Amino acid sequence: MASRSAGSLITHNNVTYIPPALMPGYRGHIPSASFTYGDTYGNTSARCFQDFRSTVLNSSRSPYCQGGQFPTSHSNDPALVIGHRSRGWDRFLHSPSWSRYNVDFKRSDELKQFHRAAEQHRDHYRDKSGTAHQVPHFIVPVKNPQTFPLPQQVL
């Protein structure tokens, strides 16, 4: 068996040969992509998917015939670029607004009140002036000896 230290490798350049056991990354199988020594499985698969996205976007055919539209960091279509998507509360504007008829109204009202209390709690933490009041729902109770110590425990 040949080894690197023996110098018995038959390659074009012994310095650049990397044995398969020392190659970085997972060497999985992508049917349409050939594996090279310098690329990891993640880089090869990302390149494969990006090439597919680019060919679909540049063609005049429907993108739904081969799998659809995928969000990516590099694309010809600005709507598919991940950085273009909204990151704030605006992302809920396009969510469906329908409601089911078998809703537990008491539970939904309880969740709405909890959401309001959570917003007030966030405002309390963001407030640097100390004018926002603390929400009593989120105050963690402590044991009585911690808040009112006995005179013997103070010393």
Swiss-Prot record:
Gene Ontology cellular-component terms listed: axonemal microtubule
Show the InterPro entries listed in the entry. CIMIP2C (IPR052329), CMI2A-C-like_dom (IPR018902)
- Subcellular localization, as worded in the UniProt entry: Cytoplasm, Cytoskeleton, Cilium axoneme
Against Pfam families, the record matches this protein to: CMI2B-like
Q: Keyword set for this entry?
A: Cell projection, Cytoplasm, Cytoskeleton
Instruction: Output the superkingdom of the source species.
Output: Eukaryota
**Principal localization?**
cytoplasm
Report the PANTHER family cross-referenced here: PROTEIN FAM166C (PTHR34924:SF1), UPF0573 PROTEIN C2ORF70 (PTHR34924)
General function of this protein:
Microtubule inner protein (MIP) part of the dynein-decorated doublet microtubules (DMTs) in cilia axoneme, which is required for motile cilia beating.
What family is it from? Belongs to the CIMIP2 family.
Question: What protein name applies here?
Answer: Ciliary microtubule inner protein 2C
Query: Which species is this record about?
Result: Xenopus laevis
